């Protein structure tokens, strides 16, 4: 049975600087809720596209080979599998991320040039 969830109410319960957890599964994909301030490591997903949907705040997504994307509330961006990227935020940001349940994350040790 499905259950209704208020995403911002769930996010408001998060007190940590960084939290990322699954809130739902749709077929072979998971929907994750992230609440964070700061930056995540450079990485890529060799086997899954990744969809970001910002609910609150401002999410910066840096890429190895193109300009930084700036997403605000109600903006979304699809990142194709294999694309090296990282997320950053200078203010508390709440976003959804949709990706394959078994998506692999490959951390890049050095910042790409």
Swiss-Prot record:
One of its GO terms (molecular function) is manganese ion binding. InterPro entries: Cupin_2, Germin_Mn-BS, PKS_Associated_Protein, RmlC-like_jellyroll, RmlC_Cupin_sf. Residues 41-88 form the Cupin type-2 domain. Gene3D superfamilies: Jelly Rolls. Belongs to the SchB/CurC family. This is Uncharacterized protein YdbB. It comes from Bacillus subtilis (strain 168).
